[in-house]
Curated annotation (Swiss-Prot):
Cofactors (names): Zn(2+)
GO CC annotations on file: cytosol
Gene name for this UniProt entry: hisD
Cofactor binding notes: Binds 1 zinc ion per subunit.
Keyword Ribonucleoprotein: no
UniProt similarity note: Belongs to the histidinol dehydrogenase family.
Source taxonomy: Bacteria, Bacillati, Bacillota, Clostridia, Eubacteriales
Gene3D superfamilies xref list: 1.20.5.1300, Nitrogenase molybdenum iron protein domain
GO biological process: L-histidine biosynthetic process
Protein name: Histidinol dehydrogenase
């Protein structure tokens, strides 16, 4: 079921795929964003009719309290219990990430430091489609709440009846979300970036989406911050034959059931192992309701690569920079130091990637398409910023300002130099008010 690649040929294929441009899609996204910027809610209603088949003008874009109450009554006690475990684990993982402001005084009396503050309002995008991805909501909104963001909102597309899945709404309340808006696609990104009469403008947008959503995030960046450019999902499994082939096959299929999901197997156990895992994938697929999506994903983006050593496997991992990395080897902790580029790493046979999707604690909103080379999963840091703080005493200023003046003059920035020279011209200990009176 998996296409066998020669490693270098696969890396070349991957690089071509990751560097493709889609100017026709960019033109469509730009047009959507511009219409949202100009027309606000009117554009959102029109696009929701066009793309989601829902007419919301009578009921509005914002989820009402009545809808939250209906959702609470609709979900099972078992779901509530599982949700609570997930919420607790996600919050517990992210709390230690919260940084503190700090200040230090140098020997000359200068005080320097950093003041850490959250953004005022965060916008979370949750994809729609055939499944209610409330896990993405939890994994994005909870880090924002833990970071201290005063207001977190969510945009997600409605169904054809103009409703949001009740599990999504219950998850939103459990995560601490203020409001949910029935808006999806690139138009949702535009609404959160520019603001409309209903959807407030946010300071940071986070969450995954399809190519249209990802491109919209890229285009609005600047006036609003974004977490990353997170595209279709990926999983890469490093294997030495020590994990049951049936288990490994099931793990790979867990990502293939997403449209355009990429699955990569790197094994040191030879062609027979690839055949065994592929056969197991075929058997599992036949019994799954999303079999058609899985077969398409695997046919287009499934790959198996045979290597001789785990060191070679690690080189491939670092070249790919996968979103999800499963390390199914006899000693996963010995392999871990070899990994430099991977979004989220799952060690050992009892750690299927799907545990990370729902309940382990780290966010499942993770860099894709090789961006793990420089980017990180959504976390508390996504929603905070640092302000540098500096305070000179007079003595410290007089000691160091001449050096700063020399540097400013060397850059030929005379006004910079003058702002320091005007202070140096004052007699020691004379306040500005004393100087004015003397003049």
């Amino acid at each position: 079921m998996l296409k066998v690649w020669e490693p270098q040929a696969f890396l070349e294929f991957l690089n071509r795929r990751r560097t493709e441009f889609y100017p026709e899609i960019e033109a469509q996204v730009r047009a959507i964003l511009e219409r949202v910027r100009r027309e606000g809610d009117g554009a959102l209603y029109a696009f929701t009719r066009q793309f989601d088949g829902a007419d919301l003008e009578a009921t509005g874009l914002r989820v009402t309290e009545a809808e939250y109450r209906e959702a609470e009554a609709a979900v099972s006690a078992a779901f509530r219990a599982a949700l609570q475990v997930a919420v607790e684990n996600i919050a517990a993982f992210h709390r230690p990430q919260v940084p503190t402001s700090w200040f230090t005084t140098r020997p000359d009396g200068t005080i320097v430091g950093q003041r850490v503050t959250p953004v005022d309002r965060a916008g979370v995008y949750v994809p729609g489609g055939s499944a209610p991805l409330f896990s993405c909501l939890l994994m994005t909104a909870i880090p924002a709440v833990v970071a201290g963001v005063p207001e977190v909102i969510v945009c997600t597309p409605p169904d054809r009846n103009g409703r949001i899945d009740p599990h999504m709404l219950v998850a939103a309340r459990a995560a601490g979300v203020k409001d949910v808006y029935k808006v999806g696609g690139a138009q949702a990104i535009g609404a959160m970036a520019y603001g409309t009469a209903t959807v407030p403008r946010v300071d940071k947008i986070a969450g995954p989406g399809n190519y249209y959503v990802t491109l919209a995030k890229k285009l609005v960046f600047g006036p609003v911050g974004i977490d990353m450019l997170a595209g279709p999902t990926e999983v890469m499994a490093v294997d030495d034959g020590s994990v049951d082939a049936e288990w490994l096959a099931a793990d790979l299929l867990s990502q293939a059931e997403h449209p355009n999901g990429m699955v990569i197997l790197v094994t040191t156990a030879g062609p027979e192992r690839i055949a065994a895992v592929g056969a197991a994938m075929a058997r599992h697929t036949a019994a799954l309701p999303r079999a058609e999506t899985i077969r398409r994903s695997v046919a287009e983006l499934g790959a198996a690569l045979a290597v001789d050593t785990l060191e070679e496997a690690a080189d491939l991992v670092n070249a790919v920079g996968p979103e999800h990395l499963e390390v199914g080897v006899a000693d996963p902790w010995a392999f871990l130091p070899l990994v430099r580029h991977a979004g989220s790493i799952f060690l050992g046979r009892w750690t299927p990637e799907a545990m990370g999707d729902y309940i382990a604690g780290p966010s499942n909103v993770i860099p894709t398409e090789g961006t793990a080379r420089y980017a990180s999963p959504v976390c508390v840091e996504t929603f905070i910023k640092r302000s540098a703080v500096t305070c000179y005493s007079e003595a410290a200023f007089r000691a160091q300002a001449p050096h700063a003046v020399r540097l400013a003059l060397t850059e030929d920035l005379l006004a910079h130099a003058a702002s320091m020279q005007i202070r140096l011209a004052k007699p020691d200990g004379e306040s500005p008010s004393e100087g004015r009176e003397a003049g």
